[in-house]
Amino acid sequence: MKKDFLSILDIGEYELESIVADAVRLKRLKSAGTAHEFLRGKSLGMIFEKASTRTRVSFEVGMSDLGGHALFLNPQDMQLGRGEEIRDTARVLARYVDAVMIRAYSHAAIEEFARYANVPVVNGLSDRLHPCQVLADIMTLSERFGDLHGLKLAWVGDGNNVCNSWLLSSALTGMEIAVASPPRYRPRDEIVDQARAAGGKVTVVTDPDEAVRDADVLYTDIWVSMGDEQERAERLQALKGYTIDSRLLAQASPDALVMHCLPAHRGEEITDEVMEGPQSIVWDQAENRLHAQKALLVRLIAGGMASVD
């Protein structure tokens, strides 16, 4: 039976640990220059409604590393961009490729695609969630801390799709997630409720100092995402005071780490000093998109590394 990855909660705690372990192993194999073509002869279709750097490159390189092939599909070059229904496109593509990754404006569209495709569908980003990013982030923190249970992550700024996925992950990792956002840009209530119902420990406040107190990890993202450009001035005004700078970082645990999923607008959500500082692990998490997604694809397409060793 095919398995999709539309939300971090589509996998359980044990499966998350297994994927992270596989990702670490794949990272070592790549570093050593050892072939690891666990998906030889397999194809991944990639549909991008939104522009991308990290998502496209990491999935394309990942499939190449694994011995497979990634096919880039722009909706404007497909019948999907000319009015073909999602369900029809999903059924046809599933006859050609072994999995589909979609980066779209609408989470509902990805869910509909997954309902009609009989191959695994991966959410490469939607307006609601970004589970691939959080999977890579969890791998990155696991490399630093080992067991994540009891750690506190403070999200500062716009309660966006990455923030939503972090809230949902709390039930799987045992981490406490504290969010500081202005009222208008707080995470969705239904996501907060879902995270708590799943067993997550989450809090949402308006004061950044309160959220970061004793935090082991500080996390932020750009304040103006693709599609929100018309709100730029309003967002910058509302989020003033939510910048991760050296003063805010000092309120966290002494050895707190700083994360940002990129792209960054330095001087807005994060200062250059913090971004380039010794507590920043931004580049590690960016690299780990590659390894975590490779492990995910092996799991979804081939059943995991244990199945293909």
From Swiss-Prot:
Binding residue positions for carbamoyl phosphate: S52, T53, R54, T55, Q79, R103, H130, P131, C132, Q133, C261, L262, R289
Chain's gene name: argF
EC number(s) reported in the record: 2.1.3.3
Coiled coil feature spans: none
Superkingdom field: Archaea
One GO BP annotation of this record: arginine biosynthetic process via ornithine
Function description: Reversibly catalyzes the transfer of the carbamoyl group from carbamoyl phosphate (CP) to the N(epsilon) atom of ornithine (ORN) to produce L-citrulline.
Keywords on record: Amino-acid biosynthesis, Arginine biosynthesis, Cytoplasm, Transferase
PANTHER family: ORNITHINE CARBAMOYLTRANSFERASE, MITOCHONDRIAL, ORNITHINE TRANSCARBAMYLASE, MITOCHONDRIAL
Pathway: Amino-acid biosynthesis; L-arginine biosynthesis; L-arginine from L-ornithine and carbamoyl phosphate: step 1/3
Single Gene Ontology MF annotation: amino acid binding
Gene Ontology cellular component annotations, sorted alphabetically: cytoplasm
InterPro entries: Asp/Orn_carbamoyltranf_P-bd (IPR006132), Asp/Orn_carbamoylTrfase (IPR006130), Asp/Orn_carbamoylTrfase_sf (IPR036901), Asp_carbamoyltransf_Asp/Orn-bd (IPR006131), Orn/put_carbamltrans (IPR002292), OTCase_ArgI (IPR024904)
HAMAP family from the UniProt entry: OTCase
Protein name: Ornithine carbamoyltransferase
Similarity annotation: Belongs to the aspartate/ornithine carbamoyltransferase superfamily. OTCase family.
Binding site for L-ornithine: N161, D221, S225, M226
Catalytic activity field: carbamoyl phosphate + L-ornithine = L-citrulline + phosphate + H(+)
Subcellular location: Cytoplasm
PROSITE patterns: CARBAMOYLTRANSFERASE (PS00097)
